[in-house]
């Protein structure tokens, strides 16, 4: 929004400099982007009157003039402008004047004729106005007046970058209100009196879309002189706000737009058939706009039409056919309130961006239409003449916005601002902003004015109080946070430690959505009904996840489709389990999951490339488990296809339950081939998922004495049924080993010649040692015999020769 400082000071004139004013505006939240002078730097230019104008005797394109600038003698000036003529009021640079670019005016002769000055154009004075020839001033311009003073050129254009919520400041009226509040200064509005009708002509108005157009005003003005010249003062105000003068009717509607903040439009009355109808467009309806382009309208677009055709896109752009031209004699002035929701986005859909649409999208004061209509009528009659008809108004009270009523708590105000502002000051600030304020038990209740659509919640009021009070006036305070040592529980296993371990083992952490596709989830977690979202982002994100495996598998597919054959991922996140006894009927459980696919290692010329298998992931998971528990605390139990706990998403012969302290807390296994096909996985994929609560604590290590005596190793080979887990045999050895057995390790499994069918041979290394003495053969033999006997009794094992 660009505005002229001098125009603003006509409304409110605080005793501050330009720099102070722009700083105030910026600190109030209306950021000033730029401040530019409205004209170049020049001196010695006066208002003059061309008393005589004749042809130069020796040059066809030059004229010899005598100009009165209020001095005793007329000035002889030679001018080459085609519009120079007798009786014209002009801007005269006298001898000694300095124009922009340090151009000095001196006495001269042009083709033998003396020239003691120069008749100036806008461009020569650094004024950004498109013109052809010298300036033509109003007849009432006082001869001899300093031109800078006459046109008020000691002025600046201020460019303010308004945020989307401050539509009320898209006008001189709104900015004056703001500056008045900041400086406790009175705002002087121009006198606008109702224009008395002199004729009774009316146009019928029908609003078929009252929700989109709650108020529509129309007024006929006949016998308008559209050939009249827009006054220079109005042209200058428009120019300084970045709007080019077009014709007096358009200039007046633009002037009211800038001054009052109310967009208006003028129709050629002769081109309206039957009356005005405000309706939604018909799909595909065509309208030629004022810029000559043709718009194909959508059914959600509000239009102003007559009984046969669309005349304009409401609040956005007028139509060419009904626009005012040089032939227009009678006009219909339109002034309406269009609901922001029915204008927002429509301009962009047609590739348009107008001053009107920008204001209507953000919200126009819905109490402004009557006074804006009278202001436009007043200016139109003053400049173009005409006969005025009564205003025809159609209004839907029920569809007009209602003022927002917002409660403000004293405690909340102090808490957010971090500073106590006196009650009287709070009330004064809000009332100066136009709000109606009443006291309440907890603070106040304020009703927003009609021009403030953005005041809707308590924080909005707090912001208003803070910015008007002045953020600079709120003293700085050091944070009052108390520093204390947090109790570190050594037994807690930090998630970061697990993350670091997995990353060190070649994994990448993934974060997948908690919302999943429900039908796909049934393939991974059958038999459990998830929580279904009532308003999902999309159909494939309509259910809360029951586990992390589904998201990880989809991530593997995503990577494989992008030429990433080797994938190692892990994720920590919540699963959402329906539970009637839980809060909100849902239990949220933190889980840790991982997946591997592709080759075991990166491609290397000296290393054989092998595909990952179950034991690769099992080894990585064991490394995680060893962070939290001793070896006896966890185990893996194979799940047969017949087991009730078998997971149908996993391969029946390559999956296991994860047991911690005797409780099943997770699962590990190869993805079922059928599930691989349905997900679109490329090759073998192994996954695990475990409850984080089961592994987030660890066994605190205890320091033990190291034996100074030698250790002894004895190897045994036992034959057992193939169904017996080797881990169970090792654990049985440790159970029976007594004080001398320090370790038992499986180092070989053999099936084949010399071993009965259905059996397998397990070779186990037993390490024995004493803290007190060197073990004798009898000690070692006794321990080994006890272990063999225990294994034989428990598993039917036989010692292999």
From Swiss-Prot:
It is found in: Cytoplasm. Pfam families: B3_4, B5, FDX-ACB, tRNA_bind, tRNA_synthFbeta. Its cofactor is Mg(2+). CDD domains: PheRS_beta_core, tRNA_bind_bactPheRS. The keyword ATP-binding applies. Residues 39-148 form the tRNA-binding domain. InterPro entries: aa-tRNA-synth_II/BPL/LPL, B3/B4_tRNA-bd, DNA-bd_dom_put_sf, Fdx_antiC-bd, Fdx_antiC-bd_sf, NA-bd_OB-fold, Phe-tRNA-ligase_IIc_bsu, Phe-tRNA-ligase_IIc_bsu_bact. This is Phenylalanine--tRNA ligase beta subunit.
